[in-house]
Amino acid sequence: MLKVNYLFGCPNCNGSISVDRLHAGIPCETCLPGAVEKLDIRTIYDLLVKYSTLKGYSELYMDLEMYDDILRLFKKIVGGEPWSLQRYWLNKLVRGESFSLSAPTGVGKTTTLIVYSVYSHTTSLFVVPTKSLRDQICEKLKKIGHLVSCNKPEEDKVNVVTFHSINKNIDEFVRIKPKLLMVDDADMILKSGKTTERIAKVLQIPQEVFDDTIKMLRLKRMLRFKEDEDLINQVRELESKILGYKSSVQFIVSSATLKPKGYKQMALRFLVGFEPSTIQIYNRNVIDSFTYSNNVNELVKEIGDVGGLILVSKDYGKKYVDQITDNLNAEGYRAMKAISGRKFLEKFSNGDVDFLVGSASYYGVAVRGIDEPKRLKYVIFYGVPKTKLPLEDSLNNPLTALKIGELLKLDVTEYRKRLIYLSPAELQAVKIALRNKVSLNGKLGDLVEDLTKLKDIILDTIKANKIDKLVSDSFVIKKDTNKHYIFFPDIITYIQGSGRSSRIMNGGLTLGLSVVLVDDLELFDILNKKLRRIAEVTFMNFDELKLDEVREKLNKSRSDGSGGRSMNFKTALLVVESPTKARTISKIFGRGVRREIYGIPVYETIIIDDHSNTIIYTNIIASKGHLTDLTTEELGYYGVEINDKDIVVNYSPLYRCMSCGKTITKKVSTCPYCGSSMINSSEKIVNAIRLISTEVDEVYIATDPDQEGEKIAYDIYSLISPYNQNIFRISYNEITKTAVLNAIKSKAKINESLVKAQIARRIEDRWIGFELSSVLRSALNDNNNGTGRVQGPVLKWVVGKTSEYKANIGYVVDINIGDYVVRKFFKTKKDAETFISQLNVKVTKIAERTSTIDPLPPFTTDSLLIDAYSKFRINSSLAMKVAQELFEAGLITYHRTDSIHISPYGISIAREYLEKIGSNDFVGRSWGNEGAHEAIRPTRSMDVEELRKEIEENPFQFGIKFTWAHYRLYDLIFRRFIGSQMSSATATYTTYEININGELYTVELPTKVHGGFSSIYGIRVYNLDESHLTTRIRKGSLVSLLTYADVIRLMKDTNIGRPSTYVRTVQSLIRHGYVVESKKRSFLIATNKGQKVYEILNKYFSDMVSESRTSHLITKIDKINRNELSAEDVIMDLLNEIKNIKLVNPLQSEQYV
């Protein structure tokens, strides 16, 4: 029986433990002798105490005890059970964690903090924005009978104070040395550097540490623009000083909407280990509408109810806020301005005010600071919410300048080429230099000079052509009182502002109404299109609404909750493979926040499933690939112990050397390769995942949907099972909102057949590789030798072609007849020259026919790699790296696939795109049967030019730095996919007879192609024009060398490769020095070392590394995948095969030279 054993991970001693025990949630046999059975935490604790083996498990037990204590207290104070989100917070609070409480109003943040402040029995500080909120909290604490101070700082009490008090009496609050600091509305910290510094003092952060952190952050920013060894050393020295600091104060942040931007704010974030900001939730239950009226009073009469928020577009200014407020009051309504402070909200909540009027500004209190679910029913936008800038100022953003230049028909191609590949830091430096009119050095300096000239050209062109208005797909430029301004629709302000009418109340989401008074048709059209794509908002004409029904629903959703949308809350941990993927998922569900656990980044976001009305508070962490590997400790046969009954496979954590980058699979204190003591263990990531798993309701493991991804998922599942039993495997083929939500809905268990197949393949790789490598090291006296079963045939092909190439070197004459090339080979240069001197070419058209051509299917991994090389000379390692990044950025589907199938959703993307460009050639093809994966396709109906525009508008949205290769590969994938969903093309094939110096050649070539898919995915056509005849002599061979593309095609044809191994196999040969890749054309050439290795393998182990034997083994692995073959049988067959290697030791019989 196949069994897995980890050499670490016991929840008590962190020692060796079997998978069976981990899955049962119990410690190792040394700690807890006896049969494997599921036991609860308290029983396990008691048994460990009984056996005197209690170690680390005590922490798990104590956390549970503290959690139970605070649950009892919560029920006593509140009179009911905490919600899922409150349980999550309480769990973290009792463990002393510092973090942000992210949730909409109405889910009990303040209640949770009041309960915890009572539970903590320590000097604490509760900082709130207003006196009224301070008084409310004080009153609640007094009713509970807890020690509370509301007027002056006192030790051993809960001190409830306003920010004003903190700023006024900072020294007194520092003096009481609170152990717990809770901050409501932390925007007060984030807006003011002075307040941030005062909060740092309350947190007892030494001034020197705070100043050093600011200095370190400044130096790191400088390093973005230039590599400087002195700066790097300064940063390292500061980091070593700062990292020794650990705060003794627990810091909790609630209700923050801003991101920390200043150096003081960023320093605070660095020192407390989390972002003092909270997740922005864009969940809405809103009727979005528009009208062309501009009369607010008339609109209010039509709605027929009070409880409205009027947001005035910023370009109208404070004057219109005053005017609208006065007009409403004159009509007999009670209206009040919402400009600053909090009094307006108190009056509105108490029913003393009917309407609030404020500015449609993202940072304004009317958009950010109003949470009144019962009374606020609708939002009226006076004018399309927009940002207005002087045109000249907007040109300091070079990407905006490019778009305006294009609108003016200026040639900005060269500017685009230089800008599009800048890093975010470089682009920011250029913006700042243009805005402040300062110079930069090097290429950025030249770019700033040229962009300054472009600004002048744009302004002169607009003036010379007397242009009053320009409209693009993202902004409008208009002339206003002899000056030009640029207007952008404010998408986020609309989402946030309209969302004020739809809040959490009594466990449900209230219904809201939004009405935009359209003052600019073009801007509204841009707003409408962007909202439809980003937030799935659809606007209705206000005049077509049945207002009596709307009014009834608005009120009903607030009276008894029955008319609102009922919401469920859940907490989860989502484990992915890469940090980029973690950031992408965090972004697509709103604006998340980042914290660190044991130095590992964790992204917090809120996933909202509208269909089940579930809010999933989600922590996202990256495993960074595999967390374990077959151990190289001296255990069994290369880590595998075999006895009569079982095959026990032993796994170690991965130890990565921070100096040389090597990975080690046994416990070491120094790197065996470079001697460095800077070793990082994957145990740190395991511990971070374990910690979060204790806090959440469910764990979703979303590693890649392939064999390797399943093994990573299995390791995570096994190692965290003692901490959470609600663990699910989810998988998706693309990183989009819909795909992730569907994956969560379809959560499943680990596919153990895939895991067993991976284990068998890894054992084969280890056994064959280590044994053959041992022979090669001895034979060649070189430690950098290694090979495996798949590398053997590939090395054979490369060595063979290299030998044939060298044996047939001569001269090649290229005869270019129009755009068709005929090649002739000669042994000597003289023969080639003679041939050219006598050259006589005659081309005769002898036949022509018309035929239809069907489109090619969408890409699989092998066909993508082949086309990337043949069309753009992108070698396969770069192509796979770029495809990985495009997948992780959410732009294409999973790129390791041998399926050509397209899902109905994929087909709809092609339909949408073809309709958008006005094509009638959509056909729609599913291309084969549905399987685990789809073909490689785009995730949106966005071509490469649209992608460029998106990146120009927001260079940071995809989280990767785009290069020419990213655009080329995306364009290739997009065109191939769209073409695969189109009708057939019509081609004309022409047959030619070519007479070259008396030799006759007959060829049939496509000479015309039109219609169908050819408009998107072009087919090469030829023009054999003998009047355009050129020749060239070059050194070459009768035999071509192999490229990556050739090797991939051979691997696929001989069934010795899979999408995940195509590139890795060749890279391994290059890494060992057996093969080199030519610089110009990426040919693969065998080295002398590679030749010697092949000769040894061919002489002694030819059968073992043959194509047929390798293909046979891969077929067996596939059968294990499908549960048609036992992994144990395959492993035992391998063991018998390995014995042949050990029996044949070439060094004992002869010395290889």
UniProtKB/Swiss-Prot annotation:
Chain intervals annotated as zinc finger (RG N-terminal-type): 1-41
InterPro entries noted in UniProt: DEAD/DEAH_box_helicase_dom, Helicase_ATP-bd, P-loop_NTPase, Reverse_gyrase, Topo_IA_2, Topo_IA_cen, Topo_IA_cen_sub1, Topo_IA_cen_sub3
Zinc finger residue ranges, RG C-terminal-type: 654-681
Primary location: cytoplasm
Ranges where the Toprim domain occurs: 571-735
UniProt-annotated stretches for the region Topoisomerase I: 567-1153
Reported induction: Transcription is strongly induced at the G1/S transition.
Cofactor stoichiometry and binding remark: Binds 2 zinc ions per subunit.
Record-listed Zn(2+) 2 binding positions: C657, C660, C671, C674
Binding-site residues for ATP, renumbered to this chain: Q86, A103, P104, T105, G106, V107, G108, K109, T110
Any matching Pfam family: Toprim
Span(s) of short sequence motif DEAD box: 184-187
Domain annotation Topo IA-type catalytic: ranges: 751-1142
Molecular function as annotated in GO: ATP binding; DNA binding; reverse gyrase activity; zinc ion binding
Location(s) in or outside the cell: Cytoplasm
Keywords for the protein's UniProt record, in alphabetical order: ATP-binding, Cytoplasm, DNA-binding, Isomerase, Magnesium, Metal-binding, Nucleotide-binding, Repeat, Topoisomerase, Zinc, Zinc-finger
Ranges for domain Helicase ATP-binding: 90-276
Positions bound to Zn(2+) 1: C10, C13, C28, C31
Subunit structure: Monomer.
Note: This enzyme is the only unique feature of hyperthermophilic bacteria/archaea known and seems to be essential for adaptation to life at high temperatures. It may play a role in stabilization of DNA at high temperatures.
NCBIfam families to which the protein is assigned, alphabetical: rgy
Free-text domain note: Introduction of positive supercoils requires the cooperation of both domains. The helicase-like domain probably does not directly unwind DNA, but more likely acts by driving ATP-dependent conformational changes within the whole enzyme. A beta hairpin in the 'latch' region of the N-terminal domain plays a regulatory role in the enzyme, repressing topoisomerase activity in the absence of ATP and preventing the enzyme from acting as an ATP-independent relaxing enzyme; it also helps to coordinate nucleotide hydrolysis by the ATPase domain with the supercoiling activity of the topoisomerase domain.
Family: In the N-terminal section; belongs to the DEAD box helicase family. DDVD subfamily. In the C-terminal section; belongs to the type IA topoisomerase family.
Role noted for this protein: Modifies the topological state of DNA by introducing positive supercoils in an ATP-dependent process, increasing the linking number in steps of +1. Binds to single-stranded DNA, transiently cleaves and then rejoins the ends, introducing a positive supercoil in the process. The scissile phosphodiester is attacked by the catalytic tyrosine of the enzyme, resulting in the formation of a DNA-(5'-phosphotyrosyl)-enzyme intermediate. Probably involved in rewinding DNA strands in regions of the chromosome that have opened up to allow replication, transcription, DNA repair and/or for DNA protection. Might be a cell cycle protein.
Protein name: Reverse gyrase 2
